[in-house]
Curated annotation (Swiss-Prot):
This is 1,4-alpha-glucan branching enzyme GlgB. Catalyzes the formation of the alpha-1,6-glucosidic linkages in glycogen by scission of a 1,4-alpha-linked oligosaccharide from growing alpha-1,4-glucan chains and the subsequent attachment of the oligosaccharide to the alpha-1,6 position. It is an enzyme of class 2 (transferase). GO terms for cellular component: cytosol. HAMAP family: GlgB. It comes from the Bacteria. Its EC number is 2.4.1.18. Disulfide bonds: none annotated. Pathway: Glycan biosynthesis; glycogen biosynthesis.
């Protein structure tokens, strides 16, 4: 028995309860020379090897049959590079000792990570292929400050937590280890003795790729190369740009007909991308593609925030999909979920045995609606983890925008909570000050680091300044979903036309607050689930009236100020609710031409016409870009307004939300002349009744609605028409 290492230390090391393996393992100076110690379970013989010559310098003595070896190299005083020749089951292997390498994380990185100001923590934490002292391998780093011991386990060490315990950097709470020979494509996890003495297996929070569910291991893979933002992609996100978003759940847009299995990222690149381009959309918005264990969460309960889900292929396959979208002229928006995470024990929940990422008090840290945990935004390392993730998707994948989910649940402490179920902030208020600061900081950093990328907030309350700059007291988002507009207009459209006259304000109210935010008008996935019916099925009347009302509504929506968002299936009037376990009802477009084809053609024409005419998008957020011409004709449910571009060019939009055609409907206009009908939702091309104005109509010098000149139009039943003034 050696007197150099205490038996209790050897026992603790072998049992996996020793927190400082580098103080024992590796090469150490002693009075007798350099001593090399190694923990190599199941080994029978171990030699220290001179790499250049292959000469055996010393044989290590087995001090414990469970695999602890030690030996002295006399007359050597200075550390040198060495290898170990290890005999396992009669076979000799030459390995590099992971415990001969010094600290991995640079002092500045460690300081920035501790301060929560490391803009790109994913470049340091996680698993990264590297070469150290001429040796190739992988460096692992994980933040677990309260764990008693952390080891890397994986395919490279038989998932044995004794073989690769990590070094704790006490100043930052980060554990680190370089493992020679570990390479891309291998599975790994972190095995730890947590703060309470329990053994845990955890996926890497910073894993760049993960196993296909239900398996939960992380994959070693390098950081993807940075994607350069082009000027075209930047311009497509600007406030004066036409933005028409096709919102997609990749797992149910279309499936293989023979087995109902998902399309891969590459198949989606070949099918979804050209379809969205043909339909005239400018942006694709993807429901969360971060790795998540439960299909039914639609991705909104992620466990691998840095890993694209393996359901549809590899990380590189996802990059291929995004590249294909960009090549087709489509910007890509990613739904991003920094508001909460699931309770699965392999992921972030009680990561090191403490409430590391979440609040400890369930009144702050538990979301009862979704059975999820809420991030502790006041903890610097947690907010850094999330801010870094936002940058990661934009810089490393070329994501053009992030749509932030459930912002209201983040910024209000009493969100969906009764009295006594929440804790006021330090001033006694209901606002979550830490979450507000986190959102402001995230938007500020994105604006500074990736100018041209934007964020969009799904925020369901009247919290002021969501899309206003931070220096004006806002949250700093570029856009906000207008959920109030969506609810009001859908409530109006589901009414029998007889009763719409009594709810006229539901269509006009939105203009009273339209310029308080930069709005996106969303008809999202949330509106076609949970018994709400499809958008088509909410329309009243028989089939003709349902389709006519839907077309009129789309014509109204595309003309109303604000960017557009339509969930998949709505573009061809899917009749049933969305089912995440099945394909869209593409069979509705099979066979002869029908009403569904008509709606699909209308949406395509709406997109193309909207994009072509600057008046329809250039001044969405400027009052000069909109003016009511007829706002008070509630008895006939008629509304008429103009959209205007910076040069003063106007487009007239007229909607009739009753099934009664309105002939010789006169209203005052600003610009006399000849007006051409450029879109009519009642056109026979869309399977309407084909009522209209024969292409063009001339104004009259007849005063109406306080204006000197006027138009007399036929307003088709349940329809919206757009007219543009012809040049003289």
């Amino acid at each position: 028995m050696s007197d150099r290492i205490d038996r209790d230390v050897i026992n603790a090391l072998i049992a996996g309860h020793f927190a400082d393996p580098f103080s024992v393992l590796g090469m150490h100076k002693t009075t007798a020379g350099l001593e090399v110690r190694a923990l190599l379970p199941d080994a029978t013989d171990v030699w220290v090897i001179e790499p250049k010559t292959g000469r055996k310098l010393a044989k290590l003595e087995c001090l414990d049959s469970r695999g602890f070896f030690s030996g002295v190299i006399p007359r050597r005083k200075n550390f040198f590079r060495y290898q170990l020749a290890v005999v396992w089951h009669g076979q000799q292997n030459l390995i590099d000792d992971p415990y001969r390498f010094g600290p991995l994380i640079q002092e500045m990185d460690a300081w920035l990570l501790s301060e929560g100001t490391h803009l790109r923590p994913y470049e340091t934490l996680g698993a990264h292929a590297d070469t150290m002292d001429g040796v190739t391998g992988t460096r692992f780093s994980v933040w677990a400050p309260n764990a008693r011991r952390v080891s890397v386990v994986g395919q490279f060490n038989y998932w044995d937590g004794r073989r690769h315990p990590m070094r704790l950097r006490k100043e930052s709470g980060i554990w680190e280890l370089f493992i020679p020979g570990a390479h891309n494509g291998q599975l790994y996890k972190y095995e730890m003795i947590d703060a309470n003495g329990n053994l845990r297996l955890k996926s890497d929070p910073y894993a760049f790729e993960a196993q296909m569910r239900p398996e939960t291991a992380s994959l070693i893979c390098g950081l993807p190369e940075k994607v350069v933002q082009t000027e075209e992609r930047k311009k497509a996100n600007q406030f004066d740009a036409p933005i028409s978003i096709y919102e997609v759940h990749l797992g149910s847009w279309r499936r293989h007909t023979d087995n109902n299995f998902w399309l891969s990222y590459r198949e989606l690149a070949d099918q979804l991308v050209p379809y969205a381009k043909w339909m005239g959309f400018t942006h694709l918005e993807l429901l969360p593609i971060n790795e998540h264990p439960f299909d039914g969460s639609w991705g909104y309960q992620p466990t691998g925030l840095y890993a694209p889900t393996r359901r549809f292929g590899t990380r590189d396959d996802f990059r291929y999909f995004i590249d294909a979208a960009h090549a087709a002229g489509l910007n890509v928006i990613l739904d991003w979920v920094p508001g909460h995470f699931p309770t699965d024990d392999f992921a972030l929940a009680e990561f090191d045995g403490t409430n590391l990422y979440e609040h400890s008090d369930p009144r702050e840290g538990y979301h009862q609606d979704w059975n999820t945990l809420i991030y502790n935004y006041g903890r610097r390392e947690v907010s850094n983890f999330l801010v870094g993730n936002a940058l990661y998707w934009i810089e490393r994948f070329g994501i053009d925008a992030l749509r932030v989910d459930a912002v209201a649940s983040m910024i209000y402490r009493d969100y969906s909570r009764k009295e006594g179920e929440w804790i006021p902030n330090e001033f006694g208020g209901r606002e979550n000050l830490e979450a507000i600061e986190f959102l402001r900081n995230t938007n500020r950093i994105l604006g500074e680091q990736v100018s041209g990328a934007v964020t969009m907030a799904e925020e369901s309350t009247d919290f002021p300044g969501v899309s206003r700059p931070q220096d004006m007291g806002g949250l700093g988002f570029w856009y906000k979903w207008n959920l109030g507009w969506m609810h009001d207009t859908l409530d109006y459209m589901k009414l029998d036309p007889i009763y719409r006259q009594y709810h006229h304000d539901k269509l006009t109210f939105g203009m009273l607050y339209n310029y308080t935010e930069n709005f996106v008008l969303p008809l999202s996935h949330d509106e076609v689930v949970h018994g709400k019916k499809s958008i088509l099925d909410r329309m009243p009347g028989d089939a003709w009236q349902k389709f006519a009302s839907l077309r009129a509504y789309y014509g109204w929506m595309w003309a109303f100020p604000g960017k557009k968002l339509l969930f998949m299936g709505n573009e061809f009037a899917q009749a049933r609710e969305w089912n995440h376990d099945a394909s869209l009802d593409w069979h509705l477009l099979e066979g002869g031409d029908n009403w569904h084809h008509g709606v699909q053609r209308l949406v395509r024409d709406l997109n193309l016409t909207y994009r072509h005419h600057k008046a329809m998008h250039e001044l969405d957020f400027d009052p000069y870009g909109f003016e009511w011409l007829v706002v008070d004709d509630k008895e006939r449910s008629v509304l008429i307004f103009v959209r205007r571009d910076k040069e003063g060019n106007e487009i007239i939009v007229a909607s009739n939300f009753t099934p009664v055609p309105r002939h010789d409907y006169r209203f005052g206009i600003n610009q006399p002349g000849k007006w051409r009908e450029i879109l009519n939702t009642d056109s026979i091309h869309y399977h309407g009744s084909n009522a209209g104005n024969g292409g063009t109509v001339h104004s009259d010098e007849i005063a109406s609605h306080g204006r000197q000149h006027s138009l007399s139009l036929t307003l088709p039943p349940l329809a919206t028409i757009w007219l543009v003034r012809e040049a003289e």
